[in-house]
Structures are given as C-alpha cells and as structure tokens.
C-alpha cells in the first residue's frame, strides 16, 4: 500500500487538511494465504482467487513460501448451546464472557448448529490467522452489553475464505461483518438479523472480496462506502 495508491483512493486526508487519521504507507497491505496448484515459469496458478487487482503502477507483490507446524486443521464445533452467565441485576453487564467461539491459527474448520446467548462481543469471530472456515445454521440472541464500541459484532471475520450461511442474529450492532484488511474472499449467504442496532458490512478499512447474498437486515443497513474519519480513520471499508 504505497502513498500514491492511498492518495488515489482519497484516503490520505479525511478533510480539513489534517492527515493524522489518514491511511499510512504499508499499513493497508493485504496478505493472502494460498496454495500454488501449478507453476509454469513466472506464472502461478492459485487454489483460490485474489480479491483485488494487482498493478505494478501501485507497488509490487511478493510470493512467500512458508510452513506452519502445529496449525490447527479439520476441527469443528457443533450441536451445542453456549450461554454467557451475567449478573441479572445489571441488564447491560459487561463483566462476563464476550466471545462464544474464536478461530485462530486454523484452517478448514467449522461451527455448525450452535445456539449463542448473552455474549457481549461476538458469537463467532474468525481471527486474521483463520482460513477456510464455515459457520452455518447458528443463532445468536439476547446479547448483554452496552451499545457502542466493538460490542455485538455477532458473526465477524478478520480472516479469509470464510463462509457464514443460514445464520441468525438478534439485537446485534454489526450482525454480519468483516474487519480491518480482511483479505477475503468472505461470504455471508442466506443470513437474517432482527432489531439490528448498527450496519452490516465491513466495519473497518479495506476488507476485500466481501459478498452478501440473500441477507436480510431488519432495522439497519448494509454498508459499502468510505467511512471517512469513523472508526479512527477507516476510509473505504471495502
């Protein structure tokens, strides 16, 4: 992410001539986790598409070979109810569990048919090191928290090649969302929310390859736009 590219998308300065919240060189790099299925000279065929155009005009791309001993794979969670125990005297109590399931340092994993209740943060969050994850037929209701900040990002990915399908959320803030520079592709398919308190979509900067297909959001919007100074200078969210 070069200075020239950042300026070309209008995210170096968010008004007033003040650049403190603007994107900085090298901070918006995307890192795709792929397998090379074929190599022919200087041409590589990958196992999954990349989510933005590569143009030498705006900088260079590196291909790095790596190994990951101990990376979690082929693991799943299904047919459960997970509920966070909160202080019933405080309807917006936050001194209790925030996250139902967090997927990190893992690939080819799944969460299926899980019922989540009362979590303040996320029912399911796929961290930046999560790839090839499926979350399906899950329900999140009755979250307990204040309204604001990074709360109630119900089904949330910062990773790549994530599929959320047939998931339901009630009273979330960002019911179906992607995070900062989520490399993608990430998809939300046949998902529904009710009484949404905030928008769905990317909630931070430049989450690429984001698909919403047959998603109903009751009470708020699906947002693909330049968020400007919001979220500490998010700029284009996708």
Question: Language-model segments: what does each one mean?
Answer:
Residues 3-7:
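Extreme N-terminal leader/anchor segments
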Residues 8, 19-20, 216:
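Beta-strand-enriched cores of mature, soluble protein domains
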Residues 13-94, 98:
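Small/polar beta-strand repeat architecture
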Residues 25-28, 69, 95, 103, ...:
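Residue-level marker of regulatory loop/turn positions in helix-turn-helix DNA-binding domains and
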Residues 48, 126-128:
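Glycine-rich, histidine-containing beta strand-loop boundary motifs that form or position
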Residues 73-84, 107-118, 130-145, 158-174, ...:
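Right-handed parallel beta-helix
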